[in-house]
């Protein structure tokens, strides 16, 4: 019997079961646990495309028509990295959704072909061999300040934006809110032609239930409570009452100055009801100095924003200026300066690293242009994982590879925010039936720059060379919009997430949009235990005088990183 070395097999078909892959220039390694497209014991007839290769007429390509069920696209031999596992497979896409994960090809000539992955004349091929495939990232904390954010998001592997804003207005620069029916309609129309799913948050800072219901009927997918609008206990309670009645999520930026109460008062106002706590560490805002303690509560779904990810020697220096600009403060006013300085605490930023590694903080978003960088959600997540591996070693269950840690961290920007906001029936993971919002990465550039971003099965963004060259690869190779980013295609492959009450009220007929409006799931019964691989609830204590943080009684010492991967090796600036 002819044999292939592992190295030769990887050259021909990509790595297989038992092979380990380094993620970019980090210390993180993944190991393929299963090869559904070939590999040991199943080698032969792997679905690969090209001259002299398998996927040709009467060989790997069958006669099956699209009407017979042939997929529109097959991604061959990709290593899927998702919260549920790390496996190699062929992935089929049909009508913009994932239709099969397994072995693709022609069942007339090949064994073991998945019935939903029968390649026919109508099937396009994307070579995933040697590449990593992930679900499109979900940024759960977006300030819609300028439209250029959309391009940066796509270039960073993001396919869904949750947040609010109306442009560079002071309210939007500070708070993640699209307030009122008129602004909601205009923003849903404005974002219709980008290949991104959109979920807008209305203003929850009011005791007027009528004002909140008005926003739900106008297209808000949930609410944002922000201290700059007044996150008082009364406003929190009123917003959560409407949320409980409507089924939507509430995101909270609590009261940094403790004017209307302390963290205990906010928790009392929440009264055990589910809530998404933004930037739980507190540098982005929230009760000083102990808002981080909410990550220990079962009804709180905590997230971070990326400027504090991970804790480095530069983190503190940049935060003060960022905060003054974002919250319309003046350094010449002592009270404004005191407000800013109260939010920047190295001890809680350091503890945030640990809480992510334990799975106690469940999500990571950007806080785009409002103390965060939308293009760095994915990158900052993996930098945090790298720093924690160096400091804490392997997680339980990990050894030569870091599969447990990698699965935990990828969940923070895929399935966890999808679950938290009621989007997981449509997006958030690489699973059959979900939208084909997928990102292909070359391992050397994993988390840094995608090879291609698929939105609803269409290639929307990709690394592409000079368009006047004779082949696609000559420099400069840059992330560029592709045909899937064209406005009609983007509308056909993307969703606006709204409340079911907006659909019942006929919102689709009132808006000048082409894309489909989809209702968010009811999230009001969610708890921390519903956050895959990120459901830890350790005891968290903060000393009110020294700001020392104890996690399950142990002090987590500050050791800011002096060097990071995924940084100047990849970027000029």
Swiss-Prot record:
<dbReference type="InterPro" id="IPR006680">
    <property type="entry name" value="Amidohydro-rel"/>
</dbReference>
<comment type="similarity">
    <text>Belongs to the metallo-dependent hydrolases superfamily. Urease alpha subunit family.</text>
</comment>
<feature type="binding site">
    <location>
        <position position="226"/>
    </location>
    <ligand>
        <name>substrate</name>
    </ligand>
</feature>
<dbReference type="Pfam" id="PF00449">
    <property type="entry name" value="Urease_alpha"/>
</dbReference>
<keyword id="KW-0533">Nickel</keyword>
<feature type="binding site">
    <location>
        <position position="253"/>
    </location>
    <ligand>
        <name>Ni(2+) 2</name>
    </ligand>
</feature>
<feature type="modified residue" description="N6-carboxylysine">
    <location>
        <position position="224"/>
    </location>
</feature>
<dbReference type="GO" id="GO:0016151">
    <property type="term" value="F:nickel cation binding"/>
</dbReference>
<feature type="domain" description="Urease">
    <location>
        <begin position="136"/>
        <end position="573"/>
    </location>
</feature>
<feature type="binding site">
    <location>
        <position position="279"/>
    </location>
    <ligand>
        <name>Ni(2+) 2</name>
    </ligand>
</feature>
<keyword id="KW-0963">Cytoplasm</keyword>
<dbReference type="GO" id="GO:0009039">
    <property type="term" value="F:urease activity"/>
</dbReference>
<dbReference type="GO" id="GO:0043419">
    <property type="term" value="P:urea catabolic process"/>
</dbReference>
<dbReference type="GO" id="GO:0005737">
    <property type="term" value="C:cytoplasm"/>
</dbReference>
<dbReference type="InterPro" id="IPR017951">
    <property type="entry name" value="Urease_asu_c"/>
</dbReference>
<feature type="binding site" description="via carbamate group">
    <location>
        <position position="224"/>
    </location>
    <ligand>
        <name>Ni(2+) 2</name>
    </ligand>
</feature>
<feature type="active site" description="Proton donor">
    <location>
        <position position="327"/>
    </location>
</feature>
<keyword id="KW-0479">Metal-binding</keyword>
<dbReference type="InterPro" id="IPR017950">
    <property type="entry name" value="Urease_AS"/>
</dbReference>
<dbReference type="InterPro" id="IPR050112">
    <property type="entry name" value="Urease_alpha_subunit"/>
</dbReference>
<dbReference type="InterPro" id="IPR029754">
    <property type="entry name" value="Urease_Ni-bd"/>
</dbReference>
<dbReference type="InterPro" id="IPR011059">
    <property type="entry name" value="Metal-dep_hydrolase_composite"/>
</dbReference>
<keyword id="KW-0378">Hydrolase</keyword>
<feature type="binding site">
    <location>
        <position position="141"/>
    </location>
    <ligand>
        <name>Ni(2+) 1</name>
    </ligand>
</feature>
<comment type="subunit">
    <text>Heterotrimer of UreA (gamma), UreB (beta) and UreC (alpha) subunits. Three heterotrimers associate to form the active enzyme.</text>
</comment>
<dbReference type="InterPro" id="IPR011612">
    <property type="entry name" value="Urease_alpha_N_dom"/>
</dbReference>
<comment type="pathway">
    <text>Nitrogen metabolism; urea degradation; CO(2) and NH(3) from urea (urease route): step 1/1.</text>
</comment>
<feature type="binding site" description="via carbamate group">
    <location>
        <position position="224"/>
    </location>
    <ligand>
        <name>Ni(2+) 1</name>
    </ligand>
</feature>
<feature type="binding site">
    <location>
        <position position="367"/>
    </location>
    <ligand>
        <name>Ni(2+) 1</name>
    </ligand>
</feature>
<feature type="binding site">
    <location>
        <position position="143"/>
    </location>
    <ligand>
        <name>Ni(2+) 1</name>
    </ligand>
</feature>
<dbReference type="InterPro" id="IPR005848">
    <property type="entry name" value="Urease_asu"/>
</dbReference>
<protein>
    <recommendedName>
        <fullName>Urease subunit alpha</fullName>
        <ecNumber>3.5.1.5</ecNumber>
    </recommendedName>
</protein>
<dbReference type="InterPro" id="IPR032466">
    <property type="entry name" value="Metal_Hydrolase"/>
</dbReference>
<dbReference type="Pfam" id="PF01979">
    <property type="entry name" value="Amidohydro_1"/>
</dbReference>
């Amino acid at each position: 019997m002819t044999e292939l070395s592992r190295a030769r097999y990887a050259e021909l078909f990509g790595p297989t079961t038992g092979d380990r892959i380094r993620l970019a220039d980090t210390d993180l390694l993944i190991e393929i646990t299963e090869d559904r497209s070939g590999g040991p014991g199943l080698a032969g007839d792997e679905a690969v495309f090209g001259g002299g290769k398998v996927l040709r007429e009467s060989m790997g390509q069958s006669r099956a028509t699209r009407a017979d069920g042939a997929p529109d696209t097959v991604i061959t031999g990709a290593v899927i990295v998702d919260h549920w596992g790390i496996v190699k497979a062929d992935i089929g896409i049909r009508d913009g959704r994932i239709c099969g994960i397994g072995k693709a090809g022609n069942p007339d000539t090949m064994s073991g072909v998945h019935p939903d992955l029968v390649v026919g004349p109508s099937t396009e091929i994307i070579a995933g061999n040697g590449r990593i495939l992930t679900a499109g990232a979900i940024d759960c904390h977006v300030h819609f300040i300028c439209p250029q954010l959309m391009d940066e998001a796509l270039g960073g592997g993001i396919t869904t934006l949750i947040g609010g804003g109306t442009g560079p207005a002071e309210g939007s620069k500070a708070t993640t809110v699209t307030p009122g029916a008129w602004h909601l309609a205009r923003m849903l129309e404005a974002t219709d032609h980008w290949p991104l799913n959109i979920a807008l948050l209305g203003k929850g800072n009011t005791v007027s239930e009528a004002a909140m219901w008005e926003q739900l009927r106008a297209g808000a997918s949930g609410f944002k409570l922000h201290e700059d609008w007044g996150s008082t206990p009364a406003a929190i309670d009123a917003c959560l009452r409407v949320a409980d009645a409507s089924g939507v999520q509430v995101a909270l930026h609590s009261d940094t100055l403790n004017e209307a109460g302390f963290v205990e008062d906010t928790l009392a106002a929440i009264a055990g009801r589910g809530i998404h706590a933004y930037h739980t560490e507190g540098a982005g805002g929230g009760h000083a100095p102990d808002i981080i303690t909410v990550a220990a509560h079962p009804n709180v779904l905590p997230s971070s924003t990326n400027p504090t990810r991970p804790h480095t020697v530069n983190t503190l220096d940049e935060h003060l200026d960022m905060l003054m600009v974002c919250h319309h403060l003046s350094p010449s006013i002592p009270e404004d300066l005191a407000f800013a300085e109260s939010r920047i605490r190295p001890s809680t930023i350091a503890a945030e690293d640990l809480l992510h590694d334990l799975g106690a903080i469940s999500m990571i978003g950007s806080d785009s242009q409002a103390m965060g960088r939308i293009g760095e959600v994915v990158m900052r997540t993996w930098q945090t994982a790298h720093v924690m591996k160096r400091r804490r070693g392997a997680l339980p269950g990990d050894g030569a590879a870091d599969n447990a840690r990698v699965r935990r961290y990828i969940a923070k920007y895929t399935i966890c925010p999808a679950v938290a906001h009621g989007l997981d029936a449509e997006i958030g993971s690489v699973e059959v039936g979900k939208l084909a919002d997928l990102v292909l990465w070359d391992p050397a550039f994993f988390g840094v720059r995608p090879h291609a971003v698929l939105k609803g099965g269409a290639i929307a963004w990709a690394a592409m060379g000079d368009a006047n060259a004779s082949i696609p690869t000559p420099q400069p190779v840059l992330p560029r919009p592709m045909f899937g980013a064209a406005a009609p295609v983007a509308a056909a492959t993307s969703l606006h997430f709204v409340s079911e009450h907006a659909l019942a009220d006929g919102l689709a007929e009132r808006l000048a949009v082409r894309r489909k409006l989809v209702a968010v799931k009811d999230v009001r019964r969610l708890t921390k235990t519903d956050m895959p691989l990120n459901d830890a609830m350790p005891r968290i204590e903060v000393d009110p005088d020294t700001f020392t943080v104890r996690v399950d009684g142990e002090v987590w010492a500050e050791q800011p990183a002096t060097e990071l991967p995924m940084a100047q090796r990849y970027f000029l600036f």
